[in-house]
Amino acid sequence: MAHKKGGGSTRNGRDSASKRLGIKKFGGEHVLAGNILVRQRGTQHNPGKNVGLGKDHTLYALLEGTVLFKKGTKGKSYVSVEPAKDN
């Protein structure tokens, strides 16, 4: 009988690259129009005032201002942009 295991091939050794999801601009931060606020899968955060929703559910600023996170009805999270004072 053999006293060593046969040297078979492994089925491990794969991993997917991270997708870099998450909040990119936090509450109180100054943003410019077009800045990405949140990258997400689905709508964990919903667009509020002055925020657009991309086809991959990315939230982005529609105008210059300050980021504001708020909880809405049923615990939903909304991301808004308060316009800058000079606009």
UniProtKB/Swiss-Prot annotation:
UniProt entry keywords in alphabetical sequence: Ribonucleoprotein, Ribosomal protein
Pfam families linked: Ribosomal_L27
Domain of life: Bacteria
GO biological process terms, semicolon-separated: translation
Keyword Ribonucleoprotein: yes
A Gene Ontology molecular function term of the record: structural constituent of ribosome
Name assigned to this protein: Large ribosomal subunit protein bL27
Species of provenance: Amoebophilus asiaticus (strain 5a2)
Phylogenetic lineage: Bacteria, Pseudomonadati, Bacteroidota, Cytophagia, Cytophagales
Gene designation per UniProt: rpmA
